[in-house]
């Protein structure tokens, strides 16, 4: 999994019970006048919340009880004490072992956010799209065709303004839009703003979608992978000499001696010049399917010194990447996509490959454990999507991926790893990059031995996260080891990743000699970090400015996922997941010492206004309250528990 799958947000309840007294080690140094206790913090929000809203329910479930995390994820409050109050000496051996487990990873078994109250009365897509033809599904259609009946059961609008209608002149979701009052006539007909339509305003260009015909071919296994099968046959015939395998594409700044002379292709029978044909051609006839591109013919990846937004699972969606691009991110990468799911034509997996027009340097990240599926997937992507590079995820730490041989496990499977890299390099026409960790075990580093091999296999660029799989986020990233790896990887470019939350952190990272830096959790805590690094300053951003960023995210989300009920709730879900990271940011004006460090837990504090205090809350109920400011009230049966749980401060 990518960097963003970190056990990111704090546990519900916030940072420790430190009052206005002395700060503990590992606690953010906030000015004394802003410090408070846990009880006073929540009393303040409850009192102000009652003044600002008439809603009585301030927690995640309709009964008003805060959603508890699964039993396996709870941790003891005090050292030496078990969950049931016994001391470790008095506890049974089995109980003692259970309490020693660190809280990490995902909140498994959490309730799904998918609403179900509208699934029973869904309007037919033919009516939504105002199709003049008959129903798309014919007599087998199970959807409603009575617009009046649908409007009777449809939930109330969430607001008076529709972003899609105001931006593009027409809302494609028609009567199903949750803001339909802005563009719907009383009889249910969708309005169109003629001025915007006359100017030809269209929604932003989003590329790399999955064609329906290709999806059917993938599901029926009718797609041929000649180039991938040819590469796999070479592996089955035995080890290939290094000189006979193309070295791939090197990034700019990595000098290589490449033979760019003409490649000799053995001539077979019947290779004489064919007679001219009276049939006209519709374009140039290439031989890319027969003759592989030489290394010097491939596109090059020149991102030296640029700011690279990490491929963040769950939170690194397209609307979030648009936010980061606006603040100065140079390179973006899609969320981790599983190669087997892509080969099966799963729409949810192909959605991770979508690219917005503002992403000028964009790549996709693949995860897989076997050369055949990874090579075939690389060939498929080279024919169907527009990307600047393809990244292999060798840093995913979760058990689901690791136990199948993918992610970090590839660092210990050098033969399979080599076949994956060489096979993908042979079928791709764009550079191939790799993201790795320092190793699998906490005190056993592997990266310095693996980097020279990756360079020889033809990898264009490597990103090194300065932590091992077992370490996760309980300790700081090892930038001293990253500096050693820079020398081992030379002349191959190496990007560093880990614990960058300020421009000072970025400057220290660049002093290690890395080609550039990748930013992951820092971008989730404050996406304006890219601006701070480029302008070399601390930005004391106000709460209203932060709310405007969230409003832009919701607008981008409605454009991307839709303004109907399903799209609104999907936007809300990803907003809440992001808020579980944003709440850990401490405003610059409240800190005694700059900058904020990523491993320092924010204590309970009262901000300079109500909104700043609300944004500092670690309770999911308060995140929901913020979402209601932007997307209206939640459904009656709404429940939310963050996907990831933090142990970064332990």
Curated annotation (Swiss-Prot):
Residue list for modification N-acetylalanine: 2
Binding site for FMN: 311-313, 365, 435, 465, 497-499, 520-521
Cysteines paired by S-S bonds: none
Catalytic activity: 5,6-dihydrouridine(47) in tRNA + NAD(+) = uridine(47) in tRNA + NADH + H(+); 5,6-dihydrouridine(47) in tRNA + NADP(+) = uridine(47) in tRNA + NADPH + H(+); a 5,6-dihydrouridine in mRNA + NAD(+) = a uridine in mRNA + NADH + H(+); a 5,6-dihydrouridine in mRNA + NADP(+) = a uridine in mRNA + NADPH + H(+)
This protein's UniProt keywords: Acetylation, Flavoprotein, FMN, Isopeptide bond, Metal-binding, mRNA processing, NAD, NADP, Oxidoreductase, Phosphoprotein, Repeat, tRNA processing, Ubl conjugation, Zinc, Zinc-finger
Entry function: Catalyzes the synthesis of dihydrouridine, a modified base, in various RNAs, such as tRNAs, mRNAs and some long non-coding RNAs (lncRNAs). Mainly modifies the uridine in position 47 (U47) in the D-loop of most cytoplasmic tRNAs. Also able to mediate the formation of dihydrouridine in some mRNAs, thereby regulating their translation.
PANTHER family listed in its UniProt record: TRNA-DIHYDROURIDINE(47) SYNTHASE [NAD(P)(+)]-LIKE
Protein name as catalogued: tRNA-dihydrouridine(47) synthase [NAD(P)(+)]-like
Gene: DUS3L
């Amino acid at each position: 999994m990518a960097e963003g799958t970190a056990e990111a947000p704090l546990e519900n309840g916030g940072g420790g019970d430190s009052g206005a007294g002395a700060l503990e080690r590992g606690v953010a140094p906030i000015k004394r006048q802003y410090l408070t206790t846990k009880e006073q913090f929540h009393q303040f929000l409850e009192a102000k919340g009652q003044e600002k809203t008439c809603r009585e329910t301030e927690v995640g479930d309709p009964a008003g009880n805060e959603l508890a995390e699964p039993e396996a994820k709870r941790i003891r409050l005090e050292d030496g004490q078990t969950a049931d109050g016994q001391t470790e000496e008095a506890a049974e051996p089995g109980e003692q072992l259970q309490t020693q487990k660190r809280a990490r990873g995902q909140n498994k078994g959490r309730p799904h956010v998918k609403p179900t109250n509208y699934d029973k009365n869904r309007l037919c897509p033919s009516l939504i799209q105002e199709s003049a033809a008959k129903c798309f599904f014919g007599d087998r259609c199970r959807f409603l065709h009575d617009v009046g009946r649908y409007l009777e059961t449809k939930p109330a609008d969430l607001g008076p303004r529709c972003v899609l209608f105001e931006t593009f002149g027409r809302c494609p979701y028609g009567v199903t839009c949750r803001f339909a009052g802005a563009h719907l006539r009383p009889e249910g007909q969708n309005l169109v703003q003629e001025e915007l339509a006359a100017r030809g305003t269209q929604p932003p260009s989003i590329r790399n979608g999955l064609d329906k015909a290709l999806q059917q071919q993938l599901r029926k296994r009718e797609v041929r992978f000649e180039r991938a099968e040819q590469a796999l046959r070479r592996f089955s015939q035995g080890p290939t000499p290094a000189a006979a395998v193309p070295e791939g594409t090197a990034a700019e700044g990595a000098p290589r001696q490449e033979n760019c002379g003409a490649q000799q292709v053995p001539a077979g029978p019947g290779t004489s010049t064919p007679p001219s044909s009276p049939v006209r051609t519709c374009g140039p006839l290439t031989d890319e399917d027969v003759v592989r591109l030489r290394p010097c013919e491939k596109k090059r990846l020149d991102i030296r010194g640029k700011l690279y937004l990490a491929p963040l699972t769950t939170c690194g969606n397209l609307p979030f990447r648009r936010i980061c691009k606006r603040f100065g991110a140079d390179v973006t990468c899609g969320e981790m996509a599983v190669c087997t799911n892509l080969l099966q034509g799963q729409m949810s997996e192909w959605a991770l490959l979508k690219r917005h027009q503002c992403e000028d340097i964009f790549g996709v990240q693949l995860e897989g454990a076997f050369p055949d599926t990874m090579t075939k997937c690389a060939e498929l992507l080279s024919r169907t999507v527009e990307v600047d590079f393809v990244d292999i995820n060798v840093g995913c730490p979760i058990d689901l991926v690791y136990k199948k041989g993918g992610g970090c496990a590839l660092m210990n499977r050098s033969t399979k790893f080599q076949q994956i890299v060489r096979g993908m390099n042979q079928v791709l026409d764009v550079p191939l990059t790799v993201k790795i960790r320092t190793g699998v075990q906490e005190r056993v580093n592997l990266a310095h031995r693996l980097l020279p091999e990756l360079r020889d296999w033809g990898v264009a660029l490597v990103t090194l996260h300065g932590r091992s799989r077992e370490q996760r986020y309980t300790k700081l990233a090892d930038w001293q080891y990253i500096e050693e790896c820079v020398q081992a990887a030379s002349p191959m470019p190496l990007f560093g990743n880990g614990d960058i939350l300020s421009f000072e952190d970025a400057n220290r990272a660049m002093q290690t000699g890395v080609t550039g830096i990748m930013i992951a959790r820092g971008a989730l805590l404050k996406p304006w970090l890219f601006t701070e690094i480029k302008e070399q300053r601390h930005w004391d951003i106000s709460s209203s400015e932060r709310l405007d960023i969230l409003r832009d995210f919701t607008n981008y989300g409605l454009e991307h996922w839709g303004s109907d009920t399903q799209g609104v709730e999907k936007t809300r879900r990803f907003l809440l997941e992001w808020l579980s990271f944003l709440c850990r940011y401490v405003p610059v004006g409240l800190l005694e010492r700059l900058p904020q460090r990523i491993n320092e837990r924010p204590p309970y504090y009262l901000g300079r206004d109500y909104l700043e205090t609300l944004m500092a809350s670690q309770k999911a109920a308060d995140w929901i309250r913020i979402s209601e400011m932007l997307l209206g009230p939640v459904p009656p049966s709404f429940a939310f528990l963050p996907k990831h749980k933090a142990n970064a401060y332990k």
